[in-house]
């Protein structure tokens, strides 16, 4: 059941954003759409929206308890979330704790190599350009953020990793890497936005030694491994044990 909402403001690959009666708040609906390779691969996965919404809500509240500001205000249904309206900064911030994926394709670093301190990469958020990797000089050239804002973004991202990595270790999940999106609210405050879920994180199950069976994230969809929703459900099950009762705005 959907909450009362205003007009559709934006629809992306994984979420819809709707207006509310409050000009500084919007409702986010998590969709069942699955995409990979910049939407070249697509599918509908039943229950994906609910799982990602419920995981994200619990992790936003975990981070909030550790002083990390986010756009999250509370749940508004199984697949709905009330959030602050933010102006999204067109940078994707990726933290890498363990080498895998594009890092191993682009460098001679072996998959599974621990990275400490975590590698922080910045990507230009532009689907038409394929979200290219940026250098600091290119960030300045594009005028996306000034040096002070970039420093604040990187500090916040590392704080988030500093909370999430030991949290997931306690759940016997390795936080391999993850993507963050950040934005500015009406007051100009830098906030964590978007979501934190198996769509945006790589999780490896520490209870499994099999390189495919241990994958509990979107790589199961990318690699046609099957069991995608079972993997997402396992992540929610473990997160729920530590964060059982997220706020409800209804």
Swiss-Prot record:
Signal peptide: none annotated. GO terms for biological process: 'de novo' IMP biosynthetic process; cobalamin biosynthetic process. GO terms for molecular function: ATP binding; phosphoribosylaminoimidazolesuccinocarboxamide synthase activity. Its EC number is 6.3.2.6. It comes from the Bacteria. HAMAP family: SAICAR_synth (MF_00137). PANTHER family: MULTIFUNCTIONAL PROTEIN ADE2, SI:DKEY-6E2.2. This is Phosphoribosylaminoimidazole-succinocarboxamide synthase. The gene is purC.
């Amino acid at each position: 059941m959907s909450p009362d909402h205003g007009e559709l403001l934006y629809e992306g690959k994984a979420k819809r954003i709707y207006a509310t009666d409050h000009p500084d708040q919007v409702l986010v609906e998590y969709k069942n759409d699955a995409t990979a390779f910049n939407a070249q691969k697509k599918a509908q996965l039943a229950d994906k929206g609910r799982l990602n919404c419920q995981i994200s809500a619990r992790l936003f509240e975990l981070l909030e308890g550790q002083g990390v500001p986010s756009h999250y205000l509370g749940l508004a249904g199984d697949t709905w979330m009330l959030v602050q309206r933010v102006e999204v900064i067109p940078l994707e911030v990726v933290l890498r704790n363990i080498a895998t994926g594009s890092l191993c394709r682009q460098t001679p670093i072996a998959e599974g190599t621990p990275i400490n301190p975590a590698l922080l990469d910045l990507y230009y958020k532009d689907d038409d350009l394929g979200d290219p990797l940026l250098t600091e000089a290119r960030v300045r050239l594009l005028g996306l953020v000034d040096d002070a804002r970039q420093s604040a973004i990187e500090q916040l991202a590392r704080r988030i990793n500093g909370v999430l990595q030991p949290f997931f270790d306690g759940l016997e999940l390795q936080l391999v890497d993850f993507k963050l999106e950040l934005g500015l609210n009406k007051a100009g405050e830098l906030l964590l936005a978007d979501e934190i879920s198996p769509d945006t994180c790589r999780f490896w199950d520490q209870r499994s030694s099999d390189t495919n069976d241990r994958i509990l994230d979107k790589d199961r969809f990318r690699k046609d491994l099957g069991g995608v929703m079972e993997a997402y459900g396992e992540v929610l099950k473990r997160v729920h044990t530590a964060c059982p009762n997220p706020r409800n705005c209804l």
